[in-house]
Amino acid sequence: MHLELNERRRRVLKAVIQQYIDTATPVASQDLARSLGVSSATVRNEMAALEDAGLLTHLHTSAGRLPTDAGYRFFVENLMDRAALSTQEQRMIQHQFYQIRSELNQWIHLAAAVLARTAQTAAVVTPPRAYESRFKHIELISINDALVLLVLVLHEGSVKQQTLPADPNTTQEQLSRIAGRINELCHEASAKAIANIAHNQSTNQPPLSSFEVLVIESVARAMQQFEEHVNELIHHDGLLEMLHQPEFGQVTRVREVLSILEGGTMLESLIPQALASDGVQVIIGGEHSRDELRDYSVILSRYGVNGDVAGVVGVLGPRRMAYPRSISSVRYIAGVMSDLMGDLYGERKIEPSE
């Protein structure tokens, strides 16, 4: 946001926003005069100028001032102090993730819980996903004479399982050979490409058996279903932390928050933007394209492996959010998740930038 403010006005704006974030109460000039070392009249004049600039507003003629969305934006971009997590907090978070470093599905739930606790507001996390789901490998495991377990592993680490009917005479050794052939045919392929393999067999390859076609079609279908269920992949935590804020004292606001977090579709609209962006994204109040989110601020960051597999971590809260702490928390958790992804894939991780 490009707006020139002299040093005194910057100090007044910063003080108003910090006090309003702490108290949720409009700020009067006499509240700031002593801490800023100037008279109440001087503070009133500066507040009036900041209101004329669209950075502050007031609810009633005699009431104190509170920030506008533009005021919060100026604060985030120009005034706020860094609020890095303490060394003790960082070590505790790293230890928690280290204990489940090989359990990708548990990372997501832990990330949401840790972020909610650290930022003291609602947290949202999506699992790492390839920009387009890609096949990594399958295993075929004999269950009994009539059933085979298909285990599908996608490149981003997701695992899908289903049972398939099998010929009673098929041995585990034969199943392993079939899995090996399909792994070669489908290496790094998308769902669409795998579906084509089943229906357009190459003349350069031995023909596929009916069971191999069944397996390949099942793989393609599972990958397509995975790509279609985005809503179910947004995990959240911290509803109670968020509802402790005074903005959510009314039942209608509680229902609104539940709709945003449980419904998923409103937050889902923000995920593609976060996946396509570098660094931490801060969206404040009226900057949202959806009316339902205009009383909220959202802070999001991408994590994962560059150019390949990525997810999103973030927080949702009132516009009166503790931005320095929330931004640092999101950035740190995104960095931890990227480290885990880099270790898992042995590839270049995404570094959350400033």
From Swiss-Prot:
Gene3D superfamilies: 3.30.450.40, Heat-inducible transcription repressor hrca homolog, domain 3 (3.30.390.60), Winged helix-like DNA-binding domain superfamily/Winged helix DNA-binding domain (1.10.10.10)
Keywords on record: Repressor, Stress response, Transcription, Transcription regulation
A single BP term in Gene Ontology: negative regulation of DNA-templated transcription
Keyword Transcription included in the entry's annotation: yes
InterPro entries assigned to the protein according to its UniProt record, in alphabetical order: GAF-like_dom_sf, HrcA, HrcA_C, HTH_11, WH-like_DNA-bd_sf, WH_DNA-bd_sf, WHTH_transcript_rep_HrcA_IDD
A Pfam family annotated for this UniProt entry: HTH_11
Keyword ATP-binding among record annotations: no
SUPFAM superfamilies linked: GAF domain-like (SSF55781), Winged helix' DNA-binding domain (SSF46785)
HAMAP family xref list: HrcA
UniProt family annotation: Belongs to the HrcA family.
Role this protein plays: Negative regulator of class I heat shock genes (grpE-dnaK-dnaJ and groELS operons). Prevents heat-shock induction of these operons.
Name of protein: Heat-inducible transcription repressor HrcA
Species name: Herpetosiphon aurantiacus (strain ATCC 23779 / DSM 785 / 114-95)
Annotated gene: hrcA
